[in-house]
Amino acid sequence: MKFSTILAIPFAIAFANAAAAPAVTAAPAPAADNPYTIYPPVPKTASINGFADRIYDQIPKCAQECVKQSTSSTPCPYWDTGCLCVIPNFTGAVGNCVASKCRGADVTNFRKLAVGACAAAGVWDPYWIIPASVSSALDAAATATGN
């Protein structure tokens, strides 16, 4: 048997199997064991940014300016909540601002709202992804009193 014939046989088998496989023409069906087949709808508009719009009316006044951080240092579209929740350039700037301007329950309430907004956008646990140094600063601000 020729060497070229030996090489052609596996190729022919692989080609026949590929032809028999069903074509992929649609997104996979949702499955309980595959959370990546369903994402929440993302509105492509935002009055402030995708992160701030969801929580702005509920966040403490001391944090309202903080969520208006520019999204230009991120690869995210300004309206994409999920993306903004995981980019340290953005989350770190927001978190540091909140840590410097808010104290006590205001910090705790802000963190809960941020986590909730990010979870609703489909971000994985810990949802609002912030640098460790920012988390420490927020922890300190949450235990502090006064302004």
From Swiss-Prot:
SMART domains: CFEM (SM00747). Induction: Expression is induced during hyphal growth, by ketoconazole, and nitric oxide. Expression is also regulated by RIM101, TSA1, HAP43 and BCR1. Disruption phenotype: Leads to defects in hemoglobin utilization as sole source of iron. GO terms for molecular function: heme binding; metal ion binding. Residues 34-145 form the CFEM domain. It is found in: Secreted. CSA2 could be used as a new diagnostic marker of Candida albicans infection. It comes from the Eukaryota. Heme binds at residue 80. GO terms for cellular component: extracellular region. GO terms for biological process: heme transmembrane transport; intracellular iron ion homeostasis; single-species biofilm formation on inanimate substrate. Residues 1-20 form the signal peptide. Keywords: Disulfide bond, Heme, Iron, Metal-binding, Secreted, Signal, Virulence. Its main location: secreted. Disulfide bonds join 62-102, 66-97, 76-83, 85-118. The CFEM domain is involved in heme-binding and contains 8 cysteines and is found in proteins from several pathogenic fungi, including both human and plant pathogens. The CFEM domain adopts a novel helical-basket fold that consists of six alpha-helices, and is uniquely stabilized by four disulfide bonds formed by its 8 signature cysteines. Homodimer. The possibility of a transient honotrimer assembly of the holo protein is not ruled out. Secreted heme-binding protein involved in the utilization of iron from human hemoglobin during hyphal growth. May also play a role in non-hemoglobin iron utilization. Heme transfer occurs between PGA7, RBT5 and CSA2 supporting a model in which the 3 CFEM proteins cooperate in a heme-acquisition system and form a cross-cell wall heme-transfer cascade. The ability to acquire iron from host tissues is a major virulence factor of pathogenic microorganisms. Belongs to the RBT5 family. This is Secreted hemophore CSA2. It comes from Candida albicans (strain SC5314 / ATCC MYA-2876).
